[in-house]
Amino acid sequence: MSGAVLLCLFFSINVGNIQWDLRYIPILLAFLYGGKRAGWGVAAIAVVGRIGQGGDLFLLGVVLIVLTALFYALCVNRFYMLPPRWSRIRYASLLVILPATIQTFGTLYLINYENHLSESWVAGWLYIVFLVVTVVLVTYLFETLLEKERIVAELVATEKDFTKGELAASIAHEVRNPLTVVKGFVQLLSEDKQHAEYHKLILSELDRAESIIYEFLNTTRPQTNATFHLNETAREVVALLTPYAQERSIQLTIGTCEQAIVNGNENKVKQALMNFVKNGIEASNEGDTVTIQLDRLKDRAQIEINDNGVGMSRQQLKQLGTAYFTTKESGNGIGTMVSIRIVEMMNGMVTFKSKPGKGTKVVLSLPIEKENE
């Protein structure tokens, strides 16, 4: 994108003092598909290129590039929450129209072409239309390529899940049998009071091993989907975990939105929500509040879980969701991995934001069932 923005600047069409170019397209695409860091990098290169060009209106051009980059940085998060392809294409088109319109007609007003004012305005409108058409075509290409990558990734994941499911079921069966036998004999020996503590420890570890097997199997079992009300599910989770929070002097609050009906496995969604909320409770300090906020963004439902706990470093965030990684004194990290997988199997998405000592935000995004809107 850095090279593209320079090409757009130096291979522009100049009519009098007006420079017609496509500089905003590489900047926009860098923000949308590369993130804020890439977007600001491309914008900085565009500023350097515009200064190098000089001209009577170079200062205005620099200011417009900076303001446009700031505008894109503020709007880019919304783009990530939109479903792929057409919703994103429409949003990208709107993002390019505003700065292009301000630049085009603002420049025309400042220059005030008295002799060819009507022709300049026509040229301005044609320029904006050309920008929008170009953005639509380029964004469509990006979205098509990303969609193909997603399809290939899903096919590979499905094949892996099938193989993993068969292997997991076989391993679980073979491991559970000796565990059951050992557990039975330990329970018989528990009458020996002399070693009662040892018996409790053994039983506890056997229960933990069985729990790990159960959680691992959950990642491979196919889902039975049905429509359900996400607000009600979230309220049930809060009701179930309120006593657990009160034991630790933690307050749970929930804010719901207009009714959001989603299609999926309600029990598994409840399991995922309980895991994330429980993690927030366990990471919080006495007297803290854990908030659960539901919002509806067009055709997606969003659940935010915020805590003011210990937080996580950037390195810990990268490892989050991998098996056997946990920031807690006890636990194995499989619960978080399973919860993320549950949401992803519903075409949803889980994102984490956290800083050490400043708490953690977990955002779940799920598609809303269109037939029931």
From Swiss-Prot:
Keyword Cytoplasm included in the entry's annotation: no
Enzyme Commission no: 2.7.13.3
Chief subcellular location: membrane
Protein's cellular compartments: Cell membrane
Cellular component GO terms held in the UniProt record: plasma membrane
Catalyzed chemical reaction(s): ATP + protein L-histidine = ADP + protein N-phospho-L-histidine
Entry-linked InterPro entries: HATPase_C_sf, His_kinase_dom, HisK_dim/P_dom, HisK_dim/P_sf, Sig_transdc_His_kin-like_C
Ranges of residues in domain Histidine kinase: 170-370
One Pfam family this sequence matches: HisKA
Function: Involved in a sensory transduction pathway that enhances the production of minor proteases.
Disulfide bonds: none
Enzyme class: transferase
Originating species: Bacillus sp. (strain B21-2)
Modified residues (Phosphohistidine): H173
Annotated transmembrane regions: 27-47, 57-77, 91-111, 122-142
Protein name: Sensor protein DegM
Signal sequence residues: none
Membrane topology of this protein: Multi-pass membrane protein
Keywords noted in UniProt: ATP-binding, Cell membrane, Kinase, Membrane, Nucleotide-binding, Phosphoprotein, Transferase, Transmembrane, Transmembrane helix, Two-component regulatory system
